[in-house]
Amino acid sequence: MRKNRIRILHVAQAAGGVERYIRMLLKYLDKEKFENILVCSQDFREEDYDGLVDSFEQIELNRAIGANDLRSIVEIRKLVKKYNPDIVYAHSSKAGAITRVADIGLKNHCVYNPHGWAFNMRCSDKKRMMYTAIEKIAALFCDKIICISDAEKQSALDKKICREDKLQVIFNGVDIESYESGARGAIKRRDLNIPKDAFVVGMVGRISPQKAPDVFVKMAKQVKD
């Protein structure tokens, strides 16, 4: 039963970092205010979302661009009509492109999070131009684009993906519950020969503008001070 909650339909193709983001978002969204539906690829496992989503739908979503994308667009459009969400939230470049096409003309707010622009990946100039063109066209069919760093927003502006007022920076959160166990930290200090009284900071991620290592350095300094 909906009970006047805001209904969000998430669409995701890529697992990995995108899935970790989605799981944490679903974990901390107020379930009294939000109803969550997840439409995802075969890379996701339904049992991992017990208690996190109200509905779980799995469809064929391939990473590579191909003829099957047309089928995916049709399936996503059917599911959007079925659930009639208030918000459609597309995660990552591939799901973002086909979801925005699938949602054309439907009455909801469409939000897209690239989780790192495809045109910033290491690829040929031809592919980079294609990815940029796709993002520019698809940007016409959503209400907001979430950028996970200031660098990602600036990259969109540099490529003229859309108007600045369509871009919103929302930094990724950290699920501190995963790091509250002091025992694991002590083991790592021992394994790495780190003194017990040493102040330790760390970052997991590529050293690239998309991961905003500059933000981490500033944050680490503030924590230490």
Locate each region found by the language model.
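Conserved donor-binding loops in enzymes that form glycosidic bonds
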Residues: 12-15, 172-173, 203-209
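N-terminal strand-loop element at the rim of the active site
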Residues: 6-72, 151-155, 160, 166-169
